[in-house]
Structures are given as structure tokens and as C-alpha cells.
């Protein structure tokens, strides 16, 4: 069967530069890597093709020969002494060089000697009220997670027995296989990368070193915490496998929308509707605040819609600070509805005796508009 074109294999144009080649290879190699596709022959074949294509095209001399002669340049010794493999370390060194930053030095899943694995990080979503965010609280949560097995103390082995080094990989958790030009390192199929096998598994955890259980945890929520804040509880995630360290638990907080207040950082906003007569004649009203007290707001006569009154230090506490935000009262003027005959007569009479001085904004606006359009 004819070999696929190297450029098509990587999904790049023949004019692709080194950066484009590397980016295409990285995406495809991550997608078809044997560790992510165990026992998948098609993925393994695709992975080998990707490796071969990238190795040839990243080398300027090999790429020039391929561009001129195609695959024939590498058949029957066509490359002379230049078509060998990799100098020192084989393909895994190249793979680790490219993916090192993402793979933590080329070893995924944070395994250590003896097959110990760090437990997974867990996420817990918690919703609190604005009042709770204002005052802070200590919450009790129940989290289903994996904990260290109390029978084998996390080793995974039956009490009185010990895990043994894997005979296939000699305890390394990795095996190498020669594939033409390449030496590919992959997870040991016998121990699945742990480096050890457990001949006599623990009867409770079946060799995993951990069991699933629901735990109760206390979470401290500080005053002033904001919507979307993440709280990290170190070591409270999933237990590590076979004695490995535990992961972390992340609490993602959301604050419920409040019936009266909207929050912007440490400041609070409250829209308060008042009657037309209160706006015109002035008056007072009380506002309940989150600290449990009431604040009196004085409305001067002639107050317009949209007017804001600031209540200093009546907002939210600033997280880990002695400062406090402000509460802003935003005035909305309610227009009377369902008027009685007498009310209508009084308003009509008021309209008749009103002057420009009573409504300077509307009078001035319409005068300016008329002048603008009529000249």
C-alpha cells in the first residue's frame, strides 16, 4: 500500500514553516498518543505515521530530499548514512522536548516510584446568599470522594503481603519498542505504568489503595467574598492511589441574586420607587441594610428620577480588609395609575397653573428640539 504524503499526514501545506509543523505535530500526537488510546491499533498506526512525517519534515536536509524525490529518497538506502534514527534517547526524548511543559517532564498522571499516584482534584459548587457573603459563614458540606483504604493503609496489597516490581518493565512503568526509524516509549501494558504489580490485592479496595466514601468537611467562607470565587482546600480531594498524595478540593462559590440589592464589587445598589408627590414635595423613607440596621433617606423637594443617594459604609465588606463599600439608593419616580375623577381634575388643574419654572428640563428640551429642526 502506498505511503501517505507526509504533509497530508500532518495536515499542513508544503510551504509550512517549522513553527506550523511543530504545532500540527503537537496536536495530532496528543490526540493519537498510545497512553490516551490503549489497545487501539488504528490510533497506534496513526501515531507512528505522524511521528515519521514530523521527523522527516523537521530536518531541512531530509525535507529537501523528500520534496524532490518523495518517499523514494528513503528507500533502499537512498539517504546514505543520513537516514539513521535519533542520536541518543530515541523518539521519547523528542516527544518530551516538545510536550515537556504540558507533561511535567514527560511523565503523565504524576506517578512516582512504587506505582503511587496523586489523587484527582475535586470540584464542589456552592451557592450562598448575599447576606451570607456579607457576614461570612462556616458551612458544612458532604463530599463523595475516595479515601485511603483502612485495611491495607493505601498499599493496595492484602495485609501481610507486599506489591512486587513488574517483570515486564523492571519497575520503571515504561517500555520501549523499536518502530523503524523510531524508538517509542509507552506505558507498560502489564502494570499500566505503575512499575509494580499486586499478586494478592486487598479484599476491601481490590488493589486500588482507596475506597469511595462520603466525607463531611467544614468550609470557612470569609466576609466580603465575591461571586465566582474559588476556595482551595489542600489535600481534601481524592485520596492518592497506593499511598500517593491526595488531591485538592476546590469550592466554586456563586452568590444568589438578591431581591433588592445589586452588587458591584464592594458597593451595593438599590432602586427605590417613590411617589410623584414625594419627589415633588420631598419626604423621607427608611432602607433596611445588610448589617441588620435601617438607614433614613431624606428626599429633597424637586428630586428627579435617577437621582442617587450615597449611604457611606453600608455596602459589602472588602475581603481581608477593614474597608467597607457604600450603598447607593437610586430613585425611581412612580407615575400614578387608575386615577379617580377627582384626582384627574386636580392634576389637570395643576397642569393649568404650572409654569416653565416648574418643569425646566422638559420645557427646555422641546424648545431646543424645535429650534434644531425648524431653525
UniProtKB/Swiss-Prot annotation:
Q: Where are the zinc fingers (CR-type)?
A: 136-214
Binding-site list for Zn(2+) 1: 149, 152, 202, 205
State if Chaperone is listed as a keyword: yes
Q: Which GO terms describe its molecular function?
A: ATP binding; heat shock protein binding; unfolded protein binding; zinc ion binding
Alphabetically ordered keywords of this record:
Chaperone, Cytoplasm, DNA replication, Metal-binding, Repeat, Stress response, Zinc, Zinc-finger
- Please give the chief subcellular localization of this protein: cytoplasm
Q: What domain of life does the UniProt record list for this protein's source?
A: Bacteria
Cofactor names:
Zn(2+)
Protein's cellular compartments: Cytoplasm
- Repeats (CXXCXGXG motif): which ranges? 149-156, 166-173, 188-195, 202-209
Q: Which Pfam families does this UniProt record tie to the protein?
A: DnaJ (PF00226), DnaJ_C (PF01556), DnaJ_CXXCXGXG (PF00684)
How is its cofactor bound, per UniProt?
Binds 2 Zn(2+) ions per monomer.
InterPro entries given for it?
DnaJ (IPR012724), DnaJ_C (IPR002939), DnaJ_domain (IPR001623), DnaJ_domain_CS (IPR018253), HSP40/DnaJ_pept-bd (IPR008971), HSP_DnaJ_Cys-rich_dom (IPR001305), HSP_DnaJ_Cys-rich_dom_sf (IPR036410), J_dom_sf (IPR036869)
Instruction: Name the protein family.
Output: Belongs to the DnaJ family.
Q: How does it assemble?
A: Homodimer.
Let me see what the UniProt entry remarks about domains.
The J domain is necessary and sufficient to stimulate DnaK ATPase activity. Zinc center 1 plays an important role in the autonomous, DnaK-independent chaperone activity of DnaJ. Zinc center 2 is essential for interaction with DnaK and for DnaJ activity.
| Name of this chain's protein | Chaperone protein DnaJ
Underlying gene: dnaJ
